[in-house]
A protein has these predicted regions:
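Short, acidic loop-to-helix structural element flanking the phosphoryl-transfer center
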Residues: 1-17, 25-29, 66
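C-terminal cap/substrate-recognition subdomain and adjoining C-terminal extension
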Residues: 23-146
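Short, surface-exposed connector motifs at secondary-structure boundaries
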Residues: 10-18, 77-84
């Protein structure tokens, strides 16, 4: 996937990366170090803020749908003139999250790329223009689209 990100960075002017995950913020250091060591482009990280000593810990087990919608909407609102390629996987709620965001922001969502990790059914992408999305297995599947 690193090659996909690097090719996007080279291909698109003012390309920026925003990693949104329902993982806890406590993983930030490990995630950012991994991406840096592997040579990924710089990015912002949007992770769940939880604390063990209060009720925010329960958010760790909450459905990621609302969290991801909220985080990505903040980014879309902050950069209303940018076009976005949403990249996720079929393992959790990414297809549903991205479809909802596409419905709300069709002019900003340029592409939706979903790594198919569990033989996902294409019907999950119902309502999205077929030219706007695709399932993929490896990053090399996307290289020709960039």
């Amino acid at each position: 996937m690193k090659d996909v990100f690097l090719k996007c960075e080279a291909r698109y002017d003012n390309c920026a990366f925003h990693f949104v995950s329902a993982s806890p913020f406590q993983l930030y250091e490990d995630l950012s170090s991994f991406f840096e060591l592997e040579g990924f482009p710089l990015a912002t990280y949007h992770l769940k803020r939880i604390r063990v000593k209060d009720k925010t810990l329960l958010q760790l087990f909450a459905d990621p749908f609302d969290y991801k919608i909220g985080q990505i909407e903040r980014i879309l609102h902050k950069y209303p003139k940018r076009k976005f390629i949403l990249i996720g996987d079929s393992g959790e709620k990414d297809p549903e999250v991205y479809i909802e965001l596409y419905r709300r922001y069709p002019k900003q969502i340029e592409k939706i790329w979903i790594r198919n990790v569990n033989d996902a059914d294409a019907s999950r992408m119902e309502g999205v223009d077929g030219a706007k999305w695709r399932y993929f297995s490896t990053g090399s599947d996307l290289m020709e689209e960039i």
